[in-house]
């Protein structure tokens, strides 16, 4: 328990907001999660989701977030109700020069042999990483946050001043709206992602990713009952509508990489806007009606970075505990 529990409002109930709320409530703070989207509507629900630093910055600070998150997901995978499974798969490079820095964080990675690679692939690496079924995981995580005593308040926060008097600290995990709410950051932009969800009637378990594919990013992520097939990564594209031709292209690329996908039933087409920024913003921000911790700009790696981010948010809150609201 902190020496001076704070009243903390977390803005955002995606995977970053819920993870932060979990760590803050577990530390004994009085937490309220302010949200304007149901779990099924938020971009986190569109995530594949695989532990992989996709569109994430390459820095020592980010590496720590990655490692801390990986350790937590591995721990949680021991509990089936979380929706997390550790699965082996292949990260493929069709072009040379791919960033392999993430492999130093994952135990047991190994170089793929030429026989393992799809046609035209330059190289590949085998790894066992967490695969998260988000429809299960987000519900489980919200339930845990509620069990820890946090409250949830639906509504849109348009100005941080709205929260003065009702909170000692704000955690801003609002994704694309993060910079807008702070008013000092116009560097946040969307990276549009479109995916197709297939029925996993063939009980596939091995994942495959190629974020360096010449014809477009491709990934096949088998989960417990479905397979997420992607995708797109179009920067500054605000279109939230499904583009039918894009889905056709996604499935054609994926079938070349994993022929077993042929004939599987299409369950759903989904679009999400990843909240990107050149660097993750994870810091105490002064100069507002009350203290703010910014936690946004995770790009396509929100799930991958979520627990490390949450732990850092809790550390920053502990540093602020006992300080009066400005």
UniProtKB/Swiss-Prot annotation:
Q: Which residues bind FAD?
A: 14-16, 36, 44, 48-50, 157, 274, 299-300, 302, 304
A cellular-component GO term for this protein:
extracellular region
Q: Which reaction does it catalyse?
A: a D-alpha-amino acid + O2 + H2O = a 2-oxocarboxylate + H2O2 + NH4(+); D-phenylalanine + O2 + H2O = 3-phenylpyruvate + H2O2 + NH4(+); D-lysine + O2 + H2O = 6-amino-2-oxohexanoate + H2O2 + NH4(+); D-methionine + O2 + H2O = 4-methylsulfanyl-2-oxobutanoate + H2O2 + NH4(+)
One Pfam match = DAO
Q: What is the lineage of its organism?
A: Bacteria, Bacillati, Actinomycetota, Actinomycetes, Micrococcales
Cofactor section: FAD
Q: Which SUPFAM superfamilies match?
A: FAD-linked reductases, C-terminal domain, Nucleotide-binding domain
Q: Assembly and interactions?
A: Homodimer.
Where, by residue number, does D-proline bind? 219, 274, 300
- Supply the source organism for this entry: Glutamicibacter protophormiae
Which gene is annotated as encoding this protein in its UniProt record?
dao
| Biological process annotations from GO | D-amino acid catabolic process
- What are the temperature characteristics of this protein's activity? Optimum temperature is 30 degrees Celsius.
Q: Name one GO molecular function term.
A: glycine oxidase activity
Tell me the compartments it is located in: Cytoplasm; Secreted, Cell wall
The family line of this record is:
Belongs to the DAMOX/DASOX family.
The name this protein goes by in its record? D-amino-acid oxidase
């Amino acid at each position: 328990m902190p020496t001076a529990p704070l009243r903390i409002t977390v803005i955002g109930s995606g995977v970053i907001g819920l993870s932060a709320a979990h760590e803050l409530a577990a530390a004994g703070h009085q937490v309220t999660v302010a949200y304007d989207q149901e779990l099924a509507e938020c971009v986190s629900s569109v995530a594949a989701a695989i532990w992989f630093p996709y569109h994430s910055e390459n820095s020592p600070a980010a590496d720590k977030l990655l490692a801390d998150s990986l350790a937590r997901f591995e721990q949680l995978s021991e509990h089936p109700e979380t929706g997390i499974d550790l699965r082996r798969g292949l990260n493929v490079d069709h072009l040379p020069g791919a960033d392999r820095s993430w492999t130093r964080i994952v135990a047991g990675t190994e170089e793929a042999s030429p026989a393992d690679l799809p046609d035209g692939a330059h190289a590949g690496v085998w790894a066992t990483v967490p695969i998260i079924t988000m429809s299960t995981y987000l519900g489980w995580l919200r339930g845990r946050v509620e069990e820890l005593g946090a409250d949830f308040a639906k509504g849109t926060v348009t100005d941080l001043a709205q929260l003065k008097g009702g909170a000692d600290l704000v955690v801003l995990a609002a994704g694309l709206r993060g910079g807008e709410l702070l008013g000092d950051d116009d560097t946040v932009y969307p990276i549009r992602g479109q995916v197709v969800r297939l029925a996993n009637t063939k009980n596939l378990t091995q994942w495959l990713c190629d974020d360096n594919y010449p014809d477009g990013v491709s990934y096949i992520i088998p989960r417990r009952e479905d397979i997420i097939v992607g995708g797109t990564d179009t920067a500054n594209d605000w279109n939230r509508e499904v583009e039918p031709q894009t889905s056709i292209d996604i499935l054609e690329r994926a079938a070349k990489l994993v022929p077993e996908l042929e004939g599987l039933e299409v369950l759903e087409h989904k679009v999400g806007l990843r909240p990107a920024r050149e660097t993750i913003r994870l810091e105490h921000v002064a100069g507002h009606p009350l203290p703010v911790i910014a936690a946004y700009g995770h790009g396509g790696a929100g799930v991958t970075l979520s627990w490390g981010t949450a732990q850092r948010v809790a550390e920053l809150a502990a540093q602020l505990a006992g300080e009066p609201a400005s």
